[in-house]
UniProtKB/Swiss-Prot annotation:
The name this protein goes by in its record: Methanol dehydrogenase [cytochrome c] subunit 1
EC number, UniProt record: 1.1.2.7
Topology within the bilayer: Peripheral membrane protein
GO MF annotations in UniProt: alcohol dehydrogenase (cytochrome c(L)) activity; calcium ion binding
Example GO BP: methanol metabolic process
Role of this protein: Catalyzes the oxidation of primary alcohols including methanol.
Residues binding Ca(2+): 173, 257
Organism per entry: Methylophilus methylotrophus (Bacterium W3A1)
Residues at the active site: 299 (proton acceptor)
Signal peptide limits: none
Cofactor(s) listed in the protein's UniProt record: Ca(2+); pyrroloquinoline quinone
Cofactor binding, note field: Binds 1 Ca(2+) ion per subunit. Binds 1 PQQ per subunit. PQQ is inserted between disulfide Cys-105-Cys-106 and the indole ring of Trp-239.
Cell location: Cell inner membrane
Disulfide bonds: 105-106, 146-169, 381-410
Amino acid sequence: MADADLDKQVNTAGAWPIATGGYYSQHNSPLAQINKSNVKNVKAAWSFSTGVLNGHEGAPLVIGDMMYVHSAFPNNTYALNLNDPGKIVWQHKPKQDASTKAVMCCDVVDRGLAYGAGQIVKKQANGHLLALDAKTGKINWEVEVCDPKVGSTLTQAPFVAKDTVLMGCSGAELGVRGAVNAFDLKTGELKWRAFATGSDDSVRLAKDFNSANPHYGQFGLGTKTWEGDAWKIGGGTNWGWYAYDPKLNLFYYGSGNPAPWNETMRPGDNKWTMTIWGRDLDTGMAKWGYQKTPHDEWDFAGVNQMVLTDQPVNGKMTPLLSHIDRNGILYTLNRENGNLIVAEKVDPAVNVFKKVDLKTGTPVRDPEFATRMDHKGTNICPSAMGFHNQGVDSYDPESRTLYAGLNHICMDWEPFMLPYRAGQFFVGATLAMYPGPNGPTKKEMGQIRAFDLTTGKAKWTKWEKFAAWGGTLYTKGGLVWYATLDGYLKALDNKDGKELWNFKMPSGGIGSPMTYSFKGKQYIGSMYGVGGWPGVGLVFDLTDPSAGLGAVGAFRELQNHTQMGGGLMVFSL
């Protein structure tokens, strides 16, 4: 049953009702009042402090004359009337046990909110999912999705389609068994749950699963590709982003890395971690699944954004899905059946794979950059952060170009054995991270890169000192917007990547910019608040280079460019 209210908002050019910009997760906008010729005149219009520090990922929502803003832990939510944004209409500030923060990997972030049926759907780190009346903030329902006592927490932005709320838990670094959960939008009742590992019934494989590509694997593999019962603590959590095709009624997402990181402790392909899924929204049954990195040994959690487009393939308009994975590969597949069409390296520095075999879908590994116990891996590219992480990228349908925020970071990796203990980190590796080899001065760790999605080839690159963690926004005025870890919001010319405008915000940016229109005026919004995995050293005052799973050493200079904060800045002409 379709949500007419949400569908209306999705088709309203000036609204921003979904964290990724729409069902297709293209993160773009037809708004063009701000363009290349006048962007130099953009100024700060207003700002809002969340009153919370730590990393502020994601972006606010705009529905009608209301904006909804979230914060990092304790996951506060604020409703602002755009007629008077200085006044808070309502606020929801949950009380949570601070011990939850200790089991959250890589900062206490919150990636955003969802909207549907006149409700704001939010999650809390402590595993609770709630629906609030969008007008009053009253709690309509509240359910428990996951349990922090075993290391399972919520950081993902919920996703609403039709009468369903999709939600996944974090916690693969603590051995949490991943699953996608579907709840009734109006009641909060659990409709179905599909795990990443285990029996075919628990993974919810359709009878014709992977019938178009049986070489991807089909039945019984959620247990057979694991040693013993290791699949029960095998990770595969999904804390990233969803996309949805209303015509096919399929939704798409990625399951994450297997646990532990130490690959010696879990022989086998470890299905169905590291998989792109196409599932029926109503039943949760998987029509197809493509495992990008069998037996992942680098923490390349494949939960990143799935961008849906329709493009000609061999002369026929084809429904496609494109995905830049943490493993450094840009994939394009037929989203109806999972056929692999493109698999290209996003940067020449990628060395863990020599290539991806398009016939089998299997990556061809280079054993020199493996992480086995008898081999200390050095100069591994990408690092565990991936050449792409949680940032939301943008797509220009006219030029068929994807504008991506990338991390140009490599690593050394030393594994060690450890036992599983519920609620404790289950990693088994010590990492050192540092800039990749291809930057102009060999010190750059970030890129904004434009890709032709028909070929997977790069068009242009804009280098950044730090990882481009938050992703990009494309607006029809020909501008690519993004926030930087050192605190700038920037606008680039979409044709060549030339920087046309920037503004220094109060703290570093790890969220994804958004845009909306109100009373005939276009606005650009960007969260600020340094943190996330790159900012853990700054946020928690860590000095050991290997701390923060290797991030502290790579980003030790970040503290010289920005400090902690938390809020939203809004810009206009």
